[in-house]
Amino acid sequence: MDELLSRIRKCEVCKDYLPLGPRPVVQLSSFSKIMIISQAPGRRVHETGIPWNDISGKRLREWMNVDDVLFYNPLIFSIAPMGFCYPGKGKSGDLPPRPQCAPLWHPQIFKHFMGKPLILLIGQYAQKYYLRSNCGNSLTETVRNYKQYLPDYFPLPHPSLRNQNWVKINPWFMEKVIPELQKRIKELINHNP
């Protein structure tokens, strides 16, 4: 995995489309128990080079009930978004992830895993890409029906502040989905084959 990680970090496939230039932000290990696939790094993450090093990351860690030490341990969590670099700002938030990364790099990453990690699909870009025709008609439908995607995938909304209202109007998410997520994460962290 080290050689692959080195190639990913040198990737410049999308450089002409990236306003701040390429800086792929990933965290990988062949032994990871959980794989996080989301959209693309935000500006702050681009600046620090640390995945989920922002308010959304803090909230995601709260949802999973893990601290920074566990979250940034690649033996537990691999992180490879749909787009590895910050795509720039759009009219209502960041632009969509560049379409080149996932098809180019994800299959190579998955080949290097020693086991089969639980894949957290965070947001619609990741869910539509991986669940394809099995994806619900909306993020709400997909997340509500999370059990049908287990044990391979666990779909979640993006934990950004933009989605605070979504969490409020869908109380079942915090009442039912989050406890199940925390249970599965804890089981995987504590399982030593």
Residue ranges and their predicted role:
Residues 190-193:
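Short, basic, low-complexity termini and linkers enriched in Ser/Thr/Gly/Pro
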Residues 1-187:
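A polyanion-binding, active-site-adjacent surface
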